Amino acid sequence: MARRPKGRFIDGIVLLDKSTGMSSNFALQRVKRFFNANKAGHTGALDPLATGMLPVCLGEGTKFSQHLLDADKRYLVTAKLGERTDTSDSDGEVVQTRAIDFTEAQLLTALDFFRGETQQVPSMYSALKYQGQPLYKYAREGIEVPRESRPITVFELNFIGLEGDELTLDIHCSKGTYIRTIIDDLGEMLGCGAHVIMLRRTQVAQYPYARMVSLEQLEALVAQAHEQQIDPSILLDPLLLPMDTAVADFPEVNVPDAIAPYLMQGQAVRVPVNAGLKTDELVRITLGDIRRFVGIGTMNEDGLLAPKRLIVIHDEPAETD
């Protein structure tokens, strides 16, 4: 008999406010432990230098993490002008120092270059892989490997301020955009060089900034629960967002209770849907009058709703540590 996973079955999404200096995986494991969750996964790593929103999916919520990985992001970034580093951030070594000599008009013109749809060559100090190995491992050995440019979209690039040699920007961008690369390229366009000294992710998809919670806050709630001699879940679980918020922008298809069992067994079913849905378009599936979220699917060529990823409804508790 297969061993049940350790931890409890708890489904949802935590909007973690990651602190600087820690890896995203370290933060993920801490969240998983605080919630005593049987399963957890994050939705796109933040560099150790970076802070801010890191959605952590728990339990069945991990099935929808890819959709948050693909979502738009927003960042607040501060760049130090006049210095270029080998990593394009303050964790690297300064490789060039130049005078800062540009006008406000030149800065605004340079910023406009990055708005809209462009091509970006990823930094060597990234987790993208070349022949099975992350680029940053090659970079640490002083090896430069070929990288293809990738299409990105900068929906907004707002000038926040320039104080001395520090430039602050607000950037709303598509998935796969490297803010460090934007700053490095901007520094070269201005002729002075630049690197990131502060990077904070302020938004993922449409998740509210105000719902973020730090590891310190989670730890304090666990300590409070122990003092009150109550289960930590009583204080922690209200922080969870429903897992269907990861696919909130998908059109909803509601399945009547009478045919729900067939769908949950993986069968394609015929349901009344909006005529505007396209074949193979991803949809959010709900059941019955209470519109309970059970997963995502697509409409096939025969007009049937085909389940693609369904949640598991657990009847038994998982093992505890």
Curated annotation (Swiss-Prot):
It comes from Shewanella baltica (strain OS155 / ATCC BAA-1091). It catalyses: uridine(55) in tRNA = pseudouridine(55) in tRNA. Pfam families: TruB-C_2 (PF09157), TruB_C_2 (PF16198), TruB_N (PF01509). This is tRNA pseudouridine synthase B. GO terms for molecular function: RNA binding; tRNA pseudouridine(55) synthase activity. The keyword Nucleus does not apply. The active site is at residue 47. InterPro entries: PsdUridine_synth_cat_dom_sf, PsdUridine_synth_N, PUA-like_sf, PUA_sf, tRNA_psdUridine_synth_TruB, tRNA_sdUridine_synth_fam1_C, TruB_C.
